[in-house]
Amino acid sequence: AAGLPSAQTRRERIQRVVDLLVANHKDLTEAINEDFGGRIPAYSVMNDVLGSMVSLKHVRDSLEEWMIRSPRATGAMQDQLGATAYVSYQPKGSIGIIGTWNAPLFTLLSPLACALGAGNRAVLKPSEIVPNTAAVLAEAARRTLDPVEVAVVTGGPEVADLLTSLPFDHLVFTGSTTVGKLVMANAAKNLVPVTLELGGKSPSVLSRSAYISSAASRLAIAKSTNAGQLCVSPDLIYVPRENTEAFIDAFTDQFTGLFPTIADNKDMVSIVS
C-alpha cells in the first residue's frame, strides 16, 4: 500500500492546480464572461483566479504544520498507567465538491485546496449554469491533472444527483438552500458527512448615528459587485424612518456615480439568469 500522502506529495498536487490556473486563466475568464453574457475579465481574475490562488497557496505553504500530531491530556487512570494521547490528522479519502455559478472557480478550487492539503482526492462538479466555464475547466484538468487525484465531471442536475448519491467520504456543496436539502438527503442514504455553504438573507442596518453618505457609498459598491450575485451581497437595508429619503437619494447618487450608463457599459456585470 502507498500509505498516507506525504507533505511533499500534497504540495505537488496543489501546485499542479496552481499551474493549471496560471496557464489557463485567460481562457477561463473569457468563458466566464461568455457564460454571464458580460462579466469583465478583470473581476473574474480578482475574484475567481486570485481568490482561488490565495486558498491554494495558503494550504500549500501551511499543510506541513497542520499535519503534526497534536498532543492531548489523558484521564487520571490512564495517566497513571503511562498512557499518552494525541490527535493524528489523516485523510478522509475521496471528496465530492459541487460548485456554484456566481463564483464558478473559487467555489470549486478553494474547497479543493483544503481537500488536497488534507491528503484527499476529489471529484469536482461545476455548475451547469456556466457550461463554457465548466468545459474549459474540465479540459484543462484533463491535460494537467491526474484524474485519480482530481477529476472534473460536467452535466446538469441529473449528474449532481448521481454524484451526491455516491458513497464519498465527504461532500462539499455551495448553492441554494433548496438544492442543499437535496444534497443532504442523498448524502444521508450513505451516511456521508456534508459541508454546505448556502444562500440566505444578507441585511444591512443603519443606525441613527450612521454617516448616510459613506454608508450609501459602501452599500452601492457592495450591491453592484458581481451585479449583486453574491451570497454576501446586501439584499435588505434597515434605515431609521426619518433618514429613509436621505438614504435613498444618497444611494442613488452613489450608484449612478459608479455606473453613469448601463447600455454597452463593460463594467456592468450581466445577470446570469
Task: Locate each region found by the language model.
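Short beta-strand segments
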Residues: 98, 174, 197-199
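Residue-level signal for inorganic ion chemistry
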Residues: 10, 56, 119, 150, ...
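ALDH superfamily catalytic-core signature
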Residues: 145, 178-273
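N-terminal Rossmann-like NAD(P)+-binding subdomain of aldehyde/semialdehyde dehydrogenases
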Residues: 1-84
